């Protein structure tokens, strides 16, 4: 049984990245199955740190972008939205080029929080980073009367 409340539409997910950090870094949603969502980004000058390796912060942006979208696809968006509460990452090895691919899998899908395990790897399939993302599931009604 699928965990998705909305069936992922990869074209629509990619279009949603326009004019965001995901667009700037070249993040692309690539695949999904009943239990996971996959995205990738290039390892290039946009995502390098000064020594030519993938910047750890760029890995975290990929992880949080992927996990946030996964949470969004698991809720009734007419009643709820999702925001990040906490993200942590263990950087396992450096990448210099190619693409880094991330796969998000749910650890916990509760009424008010979601927790995601996000595994990043290089083109060779070897792990480069393991991230955990906690998302808050917030009622849209809670937005009424709030100023931006």
Where would I find each of the regions flagged by the language model?
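Terminal targeting signals and extreme-terminal segments of soluble enzymes
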Residues: 1-148
């Amino acid at each position: 049984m699928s965990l998705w409340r909305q069936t992922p539409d990869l074209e629509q997910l990619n279009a949603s990245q326009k004019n965001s950090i995901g667009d700037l870094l070249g993040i692309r949603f690539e695949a999904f199955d009943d239990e996971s969502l996959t995205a990738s980004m290039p390892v290039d000058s946009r995502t390098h740190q000064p020594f030519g390796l993938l910047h750890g912060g760029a890995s975290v942006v990929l992880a949080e972008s992927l996990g946030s979208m996964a949470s969004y696809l698991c809720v009734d968006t007419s009643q709820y939205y999702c925001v990040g509460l906490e993200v942590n990452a263990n950087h396992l090895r450096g990448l210099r080029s190619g693409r880094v691919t991330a796969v998000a899998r749910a650890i916990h899908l509760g009424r008010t929080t979601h927790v995601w395990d996000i595994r990043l790897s290089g083109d060779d399939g070897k792990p480069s980073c393991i991230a955990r993302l906690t998302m808050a599931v917030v009622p849209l009604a809670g937005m009424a009367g709030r100023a931006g």
